[in-house]
Amino acid sequence: MFNQQVYSNRRAKLREKMGSGIILVPGNSESPMNYTENTYHYRQDSTFLYLFGLDMPGLFGLIDANTGKDTIYGDDITIEDIIWMGTKPSIRDLAASVGVESVAPFKAIFSKVDQAKGQGAAIHYITPYRAETKLLLHELLGIRPSEVSANGSLQLIKHLVDMRSVKELIEIAEIEEACETGYQMHVTAMKMAKPGIMEQEIAGTIQGIALAHGGGTSFPTILTQNGQTLHNHDHSFKLEKGRMIIVDAGAESNRHYASDFTRTIPVGGKFSQQQLDIYNIVLKANNTATSLVKPGETYLSIHLKVAEVIASGLKDLGLMKGDVKEAVANGAHALFFPHGLGHMMGLDVHDMENYGQIYVGYDDEIRPVKQFGTGYLRLGRRLQPNFVITNEPGIYFIPALIEKWQGEKINNKFINFDNVNKYLGFGGIRLEDDLLVTESGARILGNRIPINPEEVESFSEH
């Protein structure tokens, strides 16, 4: 965890923004895989980490904006716990380490909430994403589980988005630590991408690198020859010479800040000319996005400019036709680029996505676009210094989507389907960097993973 003053300052700032009421911050409990004692890898709730910093199950935080008092609710371990799990600091000592003086047994949260309800105090919480947290809030608040989701505090969400979007220097350092691990994961994958090796062997190796650095992976690894599937978690295929693999993988730092990178690697060390033609369009799109990022720009506008770069490159190859700006305005590029350019990143790989992307990636000025493709853009709002974002353009040839568009004559005016059909077995290419928005532009976080085709080929050959 960080210095206790970091968490005290964050809670004080949140209390000031909220003005009044109590804020409920439940930590995550253990999640069983197949019986109670056999659990999934534990991951603390990111809001709890941000405000209270303690990385263990069985805790509940409360911030009282009326009195200025913060409390951590939890139970000290028993002798049975010590026998099986070893000794641990007391709840009081843990709380003191993050600047909290008040502690109480876990069950005492019920009487505290009852007292607040009796006094007519506003009770704020983030809409839960775990069923057990929803049931706990249902019991605490005395409302139906369906009402728990409906009654999440929009005021709390907006204030936390404001705070967490602008990264502190200590947070940026954590993200760069995760980026360094991510670098090692990706260059290892490049070196292992040989014909005959199984995808799962590479995936297992790079996930091991993340675990060896202490934090583990920041999301399930995507590593596949079938890159036409955007989030392909199947690692069951043997690598074939002449094909490409997409590796979309990242790590968490020990304090749970994320990295998220994607590279596309030629199996056997050499891109074909067809692959290189598409790769260079995606690389140009990636570099264009980085050059356009600066405070005051909307990420929606950058996404659309990148879409024009992709459409223009595909037009040069004879895959698209017509006016490029008109094609993008009509969403024709989304046949090949059917997702958004990027998202916020921090304590979550898709930072604060549990708050609702409408509040994290958009605001009253910039609203989501409903058009296919651009509608998947998770971040459209104006950029500010110390935002951390991803930049991940891609081009994919998805047989089912191509068949649908051709059959229904969707954007026929802008697509040369006869030429596109020659790419049906191509797969896909995605290139992703993590960016820090600076006062005047953008900085790629961490050592940039090899991305120019000759660099990638060099790593893959050796």
Predicted regions and their residues:
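Active-site neighborhoods and metal-handling regions in enzymes and metal-associated proteins
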Residues: 1-462
